[in-house]
Amino acid sequence: MKFSLCMIVKNEEAVLNRCLESMASAMDEIIIVDTGSTDATKKIATAYTDQIYDFAWTGNFAEARNYAASKATGDYIYTADADEYLEPEELQKLLQLKKVLLPEVEIVQMLY
């Protein structure tokens, strides 16, 4: 199973590294959609992915998330906000899930 991390971000330099560092090893691709950052958000993201896209903010989170999802090639899309992160034990649960996840499963949700 291939997992795509899809994120929409704007001015998240204070938290983005922690988020991506905690999730990167479980993801097969990382897609960052930037809605107009003026800080180092995109520079931080380049340490984890080259799939960074600019998206003009329209005031519609669903539109931005759908744009991010349209860039994904994974079997599953993991969405996260930049201030979210996985604790090591949660990361291990996700890595284990990837090994046993059945193709007919369409939705997985983790508590945080």
Regions inferred by a protein language model and the residue ranges of each:
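N-proximal low-complexity "stem/linker" segments adjacent to membrane-targeting elements
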Residues: M1-S25
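Short aromatic/hydrophobic "clamp" motif used to bind/position activated sugar donors
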Residues: I77
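A conserved acidic beta->alpha catalytic loop
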Residues: S22, A26, D34-I44, W57, ...
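Conserved donor nucleotide-binding strand/loop of the catalytic core
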Residues: K42-K71
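Short, well-ordered alpha-helix to beta-strand connector turns
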Residues: M27, T49, A72-G74, V105
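Acidic helix N-cap motif at the loop->helix transition within catalytic regions
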Residues: A14-N17, D39-Y48, E89
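Conserved donor NDP-sugar-binding/catalytic core segment of glycosyltransferases
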Residues: E84-Y112
